Amino acid sequence: VNAKPTPLSGCPGGIEHIPHASADSALLVFIPLPPGASLAALRLLALCCEPQFFQRLRVEQQIGYVVSCRYQRIADRDGLLLALQSPDRSPVNLLGCCKQFLRELTLCDETAFSVLRQQLAMQIRSPMNASATAVAALRQRYGLPVLTPQAVDALQHDEIIALWREMTRHRRRWRVLFTG
């Protein structure tokens, strides 16, 4: 873990093709947390996105066999990671599916927001395994945001909406890797 990253350090935006022998297409889209945004808001947004992404792209559209949307830390950046793998869709089509999902995302209402906030708070308050404890210690040591129960309790519904808008509007920050 390095010191506080600059907006382009470690994980610059852009699109990169990764050569691979498989005939399948695979796509990773990493949307970094904007500077100054709340880690708690990002984690809650990920909880909101995860089941909807799977339902829409895996169950309803049957995109392929890898369909995932979740919080992830990559190259010293917190963000939202969308992953798709398909035997019959092109990388361009997969990227279009991700963009469409984010445009049409049904953000949680106040009731669902409260449920997700409680779920996230319970995750934080539950005993951590050794790996999670080590990650939390490293984040604290390097002055990186640490997810605390207080930050989760203080979250407001409007923060999630604002974060979603910010992350989806600034696609030049996105890091896209693909095969196929």
Give each language-model segment a name:
Residues 21-28, 33-38, 74-80, 95-100, ...:
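Short acidic (Asp/Glu) and glycine-rich catalytic loops that position anionic groups and cofactors
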Residues 71-128:
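M16/insulysin-pitrilysin zinc metalloprotease superfamily fold
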